[in-house]
């Protein structure tokens, strides 16, 4: 749902995302050049043009890749974080990455699994998730509360989202909240400049990090949504 400007428009910009500052420049330019003064109509026109020129940077990136035949997933967590090279670790990372790719190509696909990296402080767990996201703007570790009405803003434009603080302070109640949150396949909300709320299928997946081995409280119903992998960076 984010609007991007991907071509030069005559003034310096820090990113491709359309910002309020960009809108001010555009409104001033259109008024001085063409005498257009209706902000509402200009925003409507921008929305129509954006809708007719949709693109998906993550899909475009993934489609541009060519596999060279080298096995990587099995040894990835060992290489970066010293995790064991075994079938469990391999299947855990493969499942997580398949979920991320599926959500990118088929938004709203059911995927309620969280890969949880467990190891000492400074092990590089957060950095690993950031690297998996490929680009900094596709990663976020800013998700602090799940009961915030504006939590959807923390998901917009991101592909891999780390829950670190929530996992660090998890208790039985908060774990149930996280499990319920992971089970959602979409959010329903209205974005700025729109009048009506709409379904927004999820295009992201969630990773967890913890320094403690016992970060999951005892749950008789099971904690199947959380897949912990021990990491040993000293190895």
Predicted regions and their residues:
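A short helix-turn-beta junction within AAA+ P-loop NTPase domains corresponding to the substrate/partner-engaging
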Residues: 216-235
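Short glycine-/polar-rich loops that comprise or flank the Walker A/P-loop
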Residues: 157-159, 184-185, 202-205, 221-227
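N-terminal nucleic-acid engagement/recognition segments and initiation subdomains in replication
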Residues: 1-75, 87-91
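P-loop NTPase catalytic core of nucleic-acid-dependent motor ATPases
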Residues: 46-156, 160
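Conserved AAA+/SF3 P-loop NTPase catalytic/coupling segment centered on the Walker-B
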Residues: 159-182, 216-222
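Conserved catalytic/switch belt of AAA+ P-loop NTPases
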Residues: 175-198
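AAA+/SF3 P-loop NTPase mechanochemical coupling elements
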Residues: 150-157, 191-209
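Conserved RecA-like P-loop NTPase ATPase core
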Residues: 126, 164, 178, 207, ...
